[in-house]
């Protein structure tokens, strides 16, 4: 089920809001595909989804660097795999593939995102919480960088 739940929280309000937005965009895409919406509508959703994905991954990776997350390289690799599948979906939609194939790939991306948030992203939650605690301890504890909430 493609729904946000509190157990998906990663300890950063900003990242949680990004995740909610990504889930909403994937739901919109799935709905458009199932409803047989015009190709232009689906293309617009895909462009927005790809752009927001890039924005979110960059923000998340920046926060993980600030948090000194040890699993950052693996996390970036997971993000890159998502980007590949998203690109594959865009190619499928631009080609002559039927909507059933596109919907199948869209469903895969939806499932992947939920598993990623509940699995990979939960692994960095302690690092985010430690970063927040360092910030609360005062200046000089975080290298002077912005908070994960900004």
Region annotations inferred by a language model:
Residues 1-150:
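Small-residue-biased structural context
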């Amino acid at each position: 089920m493609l729904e946000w739940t509190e157990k998906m929280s990663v300890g950063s309000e900003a990242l949680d809001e990004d995740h909610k937005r990504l889930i909403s965009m994937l739901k919109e895409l799935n709905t458009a595909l199932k409803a047989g919406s015009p190709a232009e509508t689906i293309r617009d959703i895909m462009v927005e989804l790809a752009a927001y994905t890039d924005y979110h991954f960059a923000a998340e990776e920046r926060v993980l660097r600030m948090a000194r997350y040890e699993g950052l390289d693996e996390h970036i690799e997971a993000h890159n795999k998502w980007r590949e599948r998203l690109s594959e979906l865009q190619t499928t939609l631009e080609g002559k593939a039927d909507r059933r194939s596109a919907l199948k790939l869209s469903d895969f991306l939806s499932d992947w995102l939920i598993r990623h948030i509940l699995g990979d992203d939960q692994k960095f939650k302690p690092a985010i919480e430690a970063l927040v605690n360092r910030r609360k301890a005062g200046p000089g504890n975080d290298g002077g960088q912005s908070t994960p909430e900004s």
